[in-house]
């Protein structure tokens, strides 16, 4: 029998791309002040990415961005404590690799979720984001009257 000693070696780590995060935040309509606050280094890149992914589900980057979110926990420690208390563990998985799919259909995200192998999925919550605030894509191929009918139908919901 060979005598061995346990060894832990970090062989890879998550790296945040601040420019990509900024693009997502701007696309969501987050204010300059909140973008600056969020992009200030907050712990490890894995922690920052995890927080980013979790906040994306609820559009909870700042007060007023999502009218259904009544309390914004600005400090990462307080934010993570709340996530863990609620049992929202899926956002913790984002410490490996993450993609932001913006302005895609539920059909698209459903296919991504169905074929997830070793990936974490966090999706905009339809319980917390008002249906009239959900973005949707209208194909250019639709005639203008069809696009208007589709838009009117969504507005009526």
Report the location of each language-model feature.
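Family-specific signature for flavin-dependent thymidylate synthase
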Residues: 1-157
């Amino acid at each position: 029998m060979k005598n061995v000693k346990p060894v832990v070696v970090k062989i890879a780590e998550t790296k945040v791309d601040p420019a990509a995060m900024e693009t997502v935040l701007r696309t969501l309509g987050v204010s300059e002040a909140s973008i600056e606050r969020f992009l200030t280094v907050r712990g490890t890149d894995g922690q920052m990415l995890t927080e980013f992914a979790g906040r994306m589900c609820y559009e909870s980057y700042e007060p007023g961005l999502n009218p259904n979110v009544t309390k914004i926990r600005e400090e990462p420690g307080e934010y993570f404590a709340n996530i863990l208390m609620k049992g929202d563990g899926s956002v913790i998985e984002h410490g490996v690799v993450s993609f932001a799919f913006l302005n895609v259909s539920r059909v698209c995200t459903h296919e991504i979720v169905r074929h997830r192998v070793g990936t974490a999925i966090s999706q905009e919550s339809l319980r917390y984001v008002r249906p009239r605030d959900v973005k949707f894509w209208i194909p250019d191929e639709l005639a203008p009257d069809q696009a208007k009918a589709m838009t009117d139908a969504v507005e009526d919901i």
